[in-house]
A protein has these predicted regions:
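Short acidic low-complexity segments
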Residues: 27-39
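A short, hydrophobic beta-strand-centered structural micro-motif
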Residues: 38-47
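Charged, amphipathic alpha-helical segments and their flanking helix caps
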Residues: 1-24, 47-137
Length: 137
């Protein structure tokens, strides 16, 4: 049976490719390995659940694309806002890599995507939710 560690390793491997790593100015991380003080464009992979003891195994993973906020002047006031254009271009590449991936015996689909604010670190991130359906041990 697979474990969430296996899912994290699979997604990490799919995204640790030059088309991604040379496009961002940060790194690809697993779990809580991302430095707390990172100000880079980083991608973080984590899995939140995976059934055990029976097939098919059903699970959920996240791919979080972090992008530092960008200063913008709105109505004469300087503010930090999401850099949506950069988030979109990185997310496009991540989704493209995920969609073209073939992992024998495993099936995953991109279930949803949303943008979330991390105001404490002055960054926004795109959360890409992945659903797994694993038919083999």
């Amino acid at each position: 049976m697979k474990q969430t560690f296996d899912l994290d390793s699979i997604i990490y491997g799919l995204l640790s490719v030059p088309s991604i790593t040379t496009f961002i100015n940060g790194e690809v991380y697993v779990g809580d390995d991302r430095p707390e003080d990172s100000v880079c464009e980083d991608i973080v992979v984590n899995s939140i659940d995976l059934t055990q003891d029976y097939l098919p195994q059903i699970g959920t993973s996240n791919v979080n694309v972090y992008v530092p906020d960008k200063p913008r002047r709105i109505k004469g006031k300087q503010q930090l806002k999401a850099c949506r254009q950069r988030m979109k271009s990185i997310t496009d590449k991540v989704v493209s890599e995920l969609k073209k991936a073939v992992v024998p015996g495993l099936k995953f689909t991109i279930e949803s995507q949303t943008v979330l604010n991390e105001s404490d670190i002055k960054q926004h991130y795109v959360n890409i939710r992945i659903s797994w359906n694993i038919q083999t041990e």
